[in-house]
Design a protein with these regions (language model features):
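Conserved C-terminal portion of the radical SAM core fold
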Residues: 70-137, 159-175
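A C-terminal junction/extension of Radical SAM enzymes
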Residues: 151-216
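Local cysteine-cluster metal-coordination motifs and their immediate loop/turn environment
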Residues: 213-240
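Short, surface-exposed, charged loop/turn segments at secondary-structure junctions
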Residues: 136-144, 184-190
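Conserved Radical SAM active-site core
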Residues: 1-61, 73-82, 242-263
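Active-site-proximal loop/turn and secondary-structure-junction residues that shape catalytic pockets
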Residues: 30-32, 54-58, 93-95, 127-131, ...
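Active-site glycine-rich loop that binds ribose-phosphate moieties when present
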Residues: 107-111, 148-155
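Surface-exposed cleft-lining segments at the edges of enzyme active sites
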Residues: 57-65, 93-103, 139-148
């Protein structure tokens, strides 16, 4: 498969032959389209790990995400067909606004977590990184957001951690070095140590290769592309606009070696 560097536009290639791939780490808010192909991929010999984002944020932030109640049902099915260790729940990003304060996130986390207890062992959290594009999108919709203080972040994280512990779920922080410095466990989205335990038949890949400050990830290849997700989340940094993402998705050719054919 070929994929472009999002900045230099240089084209890179990577083999997707099962014998050449240690494992595939997926990120998604909606795995239902994948479920019919899961058994096929497993029989082909692919080792797979899943990050499943379920937040229940309002439509003005996540206009096209599935209802969180549906997402918990799909996560359960995915977990039953793999294992609770193979599926990680992501409750991120946390966006603090006038409406969405700490109390809202605590209630929402407890509601979602109570449905997922026994079906996942980990939950990754992070507070929204206010990139310029993210700020503009929020401001355009008139959303009054603010950057919480470290004390607020830590207090909320500890509240979520306490709820999660009662549900048998471990909370980890993704790219939040300020929280890690206060004792919150660092998340590793591409966790070579965990993947080696899940797939012991594969040669371990343990090289630490962070993608940004506070990242704990193992070396990997990101074969996704910007401006291809049409869910249109307001806080997203990977899309210029939902319209552009729709246009680009229409150009997708399953027979092409890239998600999108080159112009």
């Amino acid at each position: 498969m070929a994929y472009p560097n999002p900045f230099s536009r240089a084209i890179h290639t990577v083999s997707l032959a099962p014998e050449d791939v240690h494992s595939i780490v997926f990120w998604s808010k909606h795995y239902r389209p994948l479920l019919p192909y899961l058994e096929y991929l497993q029989k082909k010999g692919f080792c797979m790990f899943f990050h499943y984002t379920i937040t229940g944020l309002p439509r003005y932030l996540e206009p096209c995400s599935p209802p969180w109640e549906l997402s918990t049902t799909i996560l359960k099915e995915l977990s039953l067909r793999t294992s609770p260790r193979h599926v990680t729940w992501r409750f991120d990003p946390i966006v603090i606004t006038e409406e969405l304060d700490s109390r809202w996130y605590i209630r929402q986390f407890a509601s979602i977590g109570s449905r997922l207890s026994g079906f996942t062992q980990r939950c990754y959290i992070s507070f929204v990184h206010l990139y310029g594009k993210t700020r503009r999108n929020l401001q355009r919709l008139g959303i009054k957001f603010r950057e919480p203080s470290l004390e607020e972040k830590l207090e909320l994280t500890l509240e979520l951690e306490g709820i999660a512990q009662g549900l048998g779920i471990e909370v980890l922080a993704c790219c939040q070095p300020d929280l890690v410095a206060k004792g919150i466990k660092m998340g590793r989205c591409v966790d070579g140590e965990l993947l080696s335990k899940l797939f012991p038949e594969r040669t371990p890949i343990l090289e630490h290769r962070p993608t940004r400050p506070g990242c704990g990830c193992t070396a990997s290849k990101d074969i996704g592309m910007y401006d291809t997700c049409s869910l249109g989340c307001t806080y997203c940094y990977a899309n210029q606009s939902r319209t552009l993402a729709h246009i680009r998705r229409q150009r997708h050719d399953p027979s092409c070696q890239m998600l999108l054919p080159t112009p």
